[in-house]
Amino acid sequence: MAELTRIEGVLRTEFGKGASRRLRRDGRIPLVVYGNELDPVHVHVDTLDLHALVRNEGVNAVFELNIDGEDNLVMVKAIDQNVLTLDIDHADLLNVKRGERVEVEVPVIHEGLPAPGAMVVQDVDVLLLEVDVLDIPEEIVLDINGLEIGEQILAKDVKMPSNAVLVSDAEELVINIVEPEEEELPEDDEAAAEGEDAAAGEEAEAPAESED
């Protein structure tokens, strides 16, 4: 597999909301590392490093976090983003071991177009999988090209990535191909349309004026 990304972490010495805000102003993101029967470790990393990691490797990224000269294999477990800027305000990491299997939610996307006159409805955005920590897929892509109205893709129909096991309910509906609903006109528009139809009918029924 490709070489893991390595990010330098610094142990935190100050805590609380004020300290976290100061870190973010200085271009740092506070993190907490959990797992493997260790006490939580509070660190901070460069904002650009973490943003690049998540952008390039996804929300389940696995990487080497160096703390005080020691590399720790970790994966992103949860991200807290600013609701306005979408910048990462905080993240939780899970300390893992090579060869360990973990449960992760993997994003699901679809590509292609259904049959003419059909519309695709995606009911779930993620599927829960059990997979080797170093083989976590960034996403699952479903091909919906040419699917007809009434066809569905359930979780059990999704081809699993190598060595991955489906944990989500096998009968969970992922993709549903439906007939588009007719758009209803607002009441005012309907009344106007009916008035126009009635006026057109009256004009058609009116006798033509005789010419002298």
Curated annotation (Swiss-Prot):
Q: A Gene Ontology molecular-function term?
A: structural constituent of ribosome
Superkingdom assignment: Bacteria
Tell me which UniProt keywords the record has, alphabetically. Answer: Ribonucleoprotein, Ribosomal protein, RNA-binding, rRNA-binding
User: Is ATP-binding one of the keywords?
Assistant: no
Gene Ontology cellular component terms for the protein in this record? cytosolic large ribosomal subunit
Query: Has the keyword RNA-binding been applied to this entry?
Result: yes
- Region annotation (Disordered) ranges: 179-212
User: Which terms does the UniProt entry file under GO BP?
Assistant: translation
**One Pfam family here:** Ribosomal_L25p
Q: Which Gene3D superfamilies match?
A: Ribosomal protein L25, beta domain, Ribosomal Protein L25, Chain P
Task: Give a short account of what the protein does.
Answer: This is one of the proteins that binds to the 5S RNA in the ribosome where it forms part of the central protuberance.
- Assembly state and interactors? Part of the 50S ribosomal subunit; part of the 5S rRNA/L5/L18/L25 subcomplex. Contacts the 5S rRNA. Binds to the 5S rRNA independently of L5 and L18.
Which protein family is it in? Answer: Belongs to the bacterial ribosomal protein bL25 family. CTC subfamily.
This protein is called: Large ribosomal subunit protein bL25
- Supply the source organism for this entry: Corynebacterium urealyticum (strain ATCC 43042 / DSM 7109)
